[in-house]
UniProtKB/Swiss-Prot annotation:
Organism: Lactobacillus delbrueckii subsp. bulgaricus (strain ATCC 11842 / DSM 20081 / BCRC 10696 / JCM 1002 / NBRC 13953 / NCIMB 11778 / NCTC 12712 / WDCM 00102 / Lb 14)
Physiological role: Binds 23S rRNA and is also seen to make contacts with the A and possibly P site tRNAs.
Recorded superkingdom: Bacteria
GO (cellular component) term, any one: cytosolic large ribosomal subunit
Name of the protein this chain belongs to: Large ribosomal subunit protein uL16
InterPro entries hit by this protein: Ribosomal_uL16 (IPR047873), Ribosomal_uL16_bact-type (IPR000114), Ribosomal_uL16_CS (IPR020798), Ribosomal_uL16_dom (IPR016180), Ribosomal_uL16_sf (IPR036920)
């Protein structure tokens, strides 16, 4: 079932800017392994669900998957063949605004090889470049860019 907000204050939102890196959610917090975004992009609720299904099917219901992003921004679209003007289009779907360095998915309770392959399958469903990260590398300071 696709992720959608239960209720929202405003149906239509501005597009906004995606400058800079993520402010929070940059470390693996729940599982042992994570999938980190290397680019900023909108990720739709269907792409999130496709990545989740790919991971859980590969793991054969073993381990646990945490989804660290949620599609809370609506995007609009006008009908095909509709001319410019006459207002903003109707809401067409939901997206999560993902900035670079954000941990999008986490896995726990499986081996590193299984987690690495599951994350590779999940990354193939997403429109951005991703990186496999481990919790112990971040705790040891391996997540810095000074190396």
């Amino acid at each position: 079932m696709p992720l959608v907000p239960k209720r929202v204050k405003h149906r239509r939102e501005f597009r906004g800017k995606m400058r800079g890196a993520a402010k929070g959610g940059k470390t693996v917090a729940f599982g042992e392994y994570g999938l980190e975004a290397l680019e900023s992009h909108w990720i739709t609720n269907r792409q999130i669900e496709a990545a989740r299904v790919a991971m859980t099917r590969y793991m054969k219901r073993g381990g646990k998957v945490w989804i660290r992003i949620f599609p809370q921004k609506s995007y609009t679209a006008k009908g095909v063949g509709v001319r410019m003007g006459s207002g903003k289009g109707a809401p067409a779907g939901w997206v999560a605004v993902v900035k670079r360095e954000k941990i999008m998915f986490e896995i726990g309770g499986v081996s590193e090889e299984t987690a690495r392959e599951a994350m590779r399958l999940a990354a193939s469903k997403l429109p951005i470049k991703c990186k496999f990260v481990k919790r112990e590398d971040q705790e040891a300071g391996g997540a810095t860019n000074e190396d």
